[in-house]
Amino acid sequence: MEKMSHDPIAADIGTQVSDNALHGVTAGSTALTSVTGLVPAGADEVSAQAATAFTSEGIQLLASNASAQDQLHRAGEAVQDVARTYSQIDDGAAGVFA
């Protein structure tokens, strides 16, 4: 039978994934200002339509990015929870043998 174990570094990896996701959300929020603040290149109708299309597409991509960052954050928290559970069980089992 194979021994089950985990590497305690998993909690650190989960924390890093969660932190990276939070940085991604911050970057998306910063980009929102640039995406929504685009001024048409000229006074013509084509420039106005291009600016509107750019803004619309940018907002959709940033919403998708925010959703992805949320999922990454949840995944990082799940890894942290698993590592915490393993540590608690290992500590409890070690107490039985001590």
Curated annotation (Swiss-Prot):
Plays a major role in RD1-associated pathogenesis, and may contribute to the establishment and maintenance of M.tuberculosis infection. Together with PPE68, stimulates the secretion of IL-10 and MCP-1 from human macrophages, via the interaction with human Toll-like receptor 2 (TLR2). It is found in: Secreted; Cell surface. Keywords: Secreted, Virulence. Belongs to the mycobacterial PE family. It comes from Mycobacterium tuberculosis (strain CDC 1551 / Oshkosh). Transmembrane segments: none annotated. The lineage of its organism: Bacteria, Bacillati, Actinomycetota, Actinomycetes, Mycobacteriales. Its main location: secreted. This is PE family immunomodulator PE35. One of its GO terms (cellular component) is extracellular region. The keyword Chloroplast does not apply. Residues 1-90 form the PE domain. InterPro entries: PE-PGRS_N.
